[in-house]
């Protein structure tokens, strides 16, 4: 049986009445994110790992209109590069695989159960403010804000506290999404406890141990980014002296 025939005949992988099935969760998440303005104009994406399968939203599709039959499925583990080596076991032939795929795989290699990519305006703005205030090597930092408690300290280390300082690394954007992979992995190595990486003038990647954690961490971070922008307008420091 050919690889293409296999990809066409695995529709059962995305057919389920269970609302918690990845093929149902990804469209629901994308509709939710569209309402926040995070995935407008087909931007952004989401991916979920279940056992040895990776479910991924397609590229170039209006995210609020995604349906379960639009979802790609990869065998895991699978090579990041070259793209032709990736082991798709379901591939809607009329759609393009997500350009975020190798970045999602980098998160799954760190034990994540879900990875989310958004084009949040607040995320973009804080990367510009950090660049202006700290230069290209600076990271986003904020402390003494209650919502910080929604972010983990690191794997198995519990959640951050009110007096902790949250640090989110920032990497430079590239012309093509997949070219961000090495910089993302370098940031993961430099900040081993982080659950997110900002991309300057682009957006953010957020991951979590499961779907609920990735979603709530993404929400908490976006809240903090918006608050940081408003604090900056008022001349208030992000990190309390």
Curated annotation (Swiss-Prot):
GO term, biological process aspect, one: L-methionine salvage from methylthioadenosine
Say what the protein does. Answer: Catalyzes the dehydration of methylthioribulose-1-phosphate (MTRu-1-P) into 2,3-diketo-5-methylthiopentyl-1-phosphate (DK-MTP-1-P).
Q: Is Transcription a UniProt keyword of this protein?
A: no
UniProt entry tagged with the keyword Metal-binding: yes
Pathway named in the protein's UniProt entry: Amino-acid biosynthesis; L-methionine biosynthesis via salvage pathway; L-methionine from S-methyl-5-thio-alpha-D-ribose 1-phosphate: step 2/6
Report the locations given in the UniProt record.
Cytoplasm
Q: Which family does it belong to?
A: Belongs to the aldolase class II family. MtnB subfamily.
Catalytic residues per the record? 146
**Quick one: which gene encodes this?**
MDE1
GO CC annotation terms, alphabetical: cytoplasm
Q: Which Pfam families match?
A: Aldolase_II
Task: Supply the name of the protein.
Answer: Methylthioribulose-1-phosphate dehydratase
